[in-house]
A protein has these predicted regions:
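Short catalytic micro-motifs in class I SAM-dependent methyltransferases
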Residues: 116-120
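Class I (Rossmann-like) S-adenosyl-L-methionine-dependent methyltransferase catalytic domain
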Residues: 1-41, 45-105, 121-135, 139-191
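A conserved beta-strand element that flanks and buttresses the S-adenosyl-L-methionine
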Residues: 113
């Protein structure tokens, strides 16, 4: 887990015991997700999107393929992840921690997304991250790992090398309400 939490080569492209075991670009892999986000949130050319914890930014790439004039930004803590982004997306990415204040004004983005990132923060770090997503986005969508029962909790604890906040879905919802989050959210489960 220590090696995985560095979020560098070993996490993304090293041995499977440290993370993804080879998170490679596959043309079109993220296209259905990109299209769904564009459709659900009514994005168009000129809209602004921020991806918090973008990793290799493959989703931003697919969104920009569908809407070439979409204004994208993304950040991650991983130098390796950012360096592996598609060339046309790299200029829009920077290294930053999700739990630190974001260098953007209020409501800068038409959509802020964070997929599979926030559960990697410690509980005391979540408040700033969630409040910043709320602050800079007109629309927001967060996806985290959660659990609904003991089996899913066990599976999540066994699988998640980097998760610091392993929470029941009711706890996530409580936190979102407590932090003033008004956006959309979703959970993934390990059944």
């Amino acid at each position: 887990m220590v090696k995985a939490k560095e979020y560098e080569f070993d996490y993304w492209d090293g041995d499977r015991r440290y993370g993804y075991g080879g998170y490679k670009f596959i043309e079109g892999r993220w296209a259905p997700v990109a299209k769904a986000l564009i459709d659900i949130y009514g994005l168009k050319n000129g809209s602004k999107v921020l991806d918090v914890g973008c990793g290799k930014a493959f989703l931003l790439y697919e969104m920009k393929k569908l809407l070439p004039e979409l204004q994208v930004a993304g950040f991650d803590i991983s130098r390796h992840g950012l360096s592996e982004a598609r060339e046309n997306i790299k200029p829009h990415l920077f290294r930053h921690r999700a739990q630190d204040r974001y260098p953007f004004g209020d409501n800068t983005f038409d959509l802020v997304i964070s997929l599979g990132t926030l559960h990697n923060l410690r509980l005391h770090e979540l408040e700033t991250a969630v409040r910043e997503i709320e602050r800079v986005g007109k629309n927001k969508y967060i996806m985290v790992e959660g659990y609904r029962n003991e089996l899913e909790q066990f599976n999540l604890e066994c699988w998640a090398l980097t998760a610091e906040s392993i929470l029941h879905t009711s706890e996530w919802i409580w936190l979102y309400n407590h932090f003033g989050y008004t956006g959309d959210y979703e959970f993934i489960y390990f059944e």
